[in-house]
A protein has these predicted regions:
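PLP-dependent aminotransferase class I/II
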Residues: 4-12, 16, 20-24, 29, ...
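Active-site PLP attachment segment
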Residues: 67-111, 137
Length: 273
């Protein structure tokens, strides 16, 4: 996140009743939160932390979610997967008004009259338009069990990242992002100097799956049509999007498998023209 561009965007949109800024943590690494919180207070906007891929992340030694944001959202499955056994999320906030509102909207804004006075719980009302965001007991049980393993998952991903960094540094056509001690590596993102998609196809032929985290919003059809934003409007996002590639990283990977991925990346990079 370019902090200067972030503040410029807020200034440019002040007249549009700007209420909040959503800050996405990419790959499990916190941005410059001190500056972000400062900007939020300066312009009187809420700071919402999108920590879907950052469960367990720390910032200056403190757990994210208990710092200066107005709201933080976590996923109980921080490593993105369409095949996850359980999908659920958690919203944390120290703002009672936001918490009450979230509790209402998570179940179609339905309120019941059941209370300590004995009113029956089949008497209900709908206060607003909500959605079905509450989770099943099975999902909750699985999520709680997985949450207990968070620290061990993080430790293993950091071990895998260390192998990638050691094996892939100084490899031609490959750029490794700067190492950060508090990075929890829900994604391990590298940059390919050119023709990223062909590189990914070559890896796939070797049995190595990769991912693209992420395609900039303004390039997606819905947002492109709705807001008519020029492709070049966000040069940082565009330049990174054209080069980035995510290598496999999850706690179940063995060192042998990680080294196999490295072998294929190195071999393809050496043959890259």
């Amino acid at each position: 996140l370019d902090i200067e561009k972030f503040e410029e965007a807020i200034i440019a949109n002040k007249s549009k009743k700007l209420r909040a800024a959503i800050i996405t943590f990419i790959g499990g690494l916190a941005p410059n939160l001190d500056k972000i919180y400062e900007i939020g207070k300066k312009y009187n906007i809420l700071i919402i932390e999108d920590c879907r891929a950052a469960l367990g992340t720390t910032y200056k030694g403190k757990k994210v979610g208990n710092l200066g944001a107005d709201m933080t959202i976590f996923s109980t499955n921080p490593s993105p997967s369409r095949y996850a056994i359980s999908r659920s999320g958690v919203l944390v906030t120290n703002n009672e008004e936001l918490a009450t509102r979230a509790k209402l909207l998570r179940n179609h804004a339905i309120t019941t009259a059941y209370d300590s006075y004995g009113n029956l719980d089949y008497v209900y009302d709908v206060d607003d338009i909500g959605h079905k965001f509450d989770i099943s007991e099975l999902d909750a049980a699985y999520a709680i069990a997985q949450l207990k393993k968070t620290d061990s998952f993080i430790k293993r991903r950091q071990e895998i990242a260390k192998i990638y960094e050691d094996r892939l540094k100084d490899i031609k056509h490959i750029t490794i992002l700067p190492h950060k001690n508090e990075h929890i590596y829900t994604q391990f993102i590298i940059k390919i100097s050119r023709n990223r998609d062909a590189f990914a196809r070559a890896l796939k032929e070797k049995g190595v799956s990769t991912a693209l985290n992420y395609i900039p919003l303004h390039l997606l059809t819905y947002y492109k049509n709705k807001y008519s934003i020029k492709i070049t409007a966000f040069p940082n996002a565009l330049n990174n999007y054209q080069q980035i590639l995510s290598l496999p990283i999850y706690a179940g990977l063995t060192n042998e498998e990680v080294n196999y991925v490295c072998d294929q990346v190195v071999q393809i990079a050496q043959e890259w023209i």
